[in-house]
Amino acid sequence: MAHPKHQVHPEDLERPEAKDWLASHQDTALKDLRLKFGLKRPYASWIAQLEVQRKYANKFPSLLLANWIFPTGQATEQSSSERTALYKASLISSQFTVDLCAGMGIDSWAFTQRDGSLGHFANELDPGLSKLLKFNLKNT
């Protein structure tokens, strides 16, 4: 994952002012926000979410609406799309599933959305991604 200062922190997006800040900067150029706020918390997390909302709206349509918190960089780029994850989940008939390389958790989320899903185990070794994975799966 990215350098620790570049990681998204879930607690930054739970702050009371986060939604208002994101809404008021929806149309502001990302480069301008980065120049103004740099890597300062909570702004770096908020700017990262704006970037994901703009760049990946078609890849994660319902998760963006569900306030899923996305990591910066490669994990978001390489993850399954929401549509692909739901398709993969539809191929599995077991009531229990395991994802040993969960990444940011899109496939894990899809496994838990299936009818008849009774349990899912998700594992991620990267500490930053693991923190987001736990937060997102608990809150969706």
What do the predicted segments below correspond to?
Residues M1-T140:
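SAM-dependent transferase fold signal centered on methyltransferase-like domains
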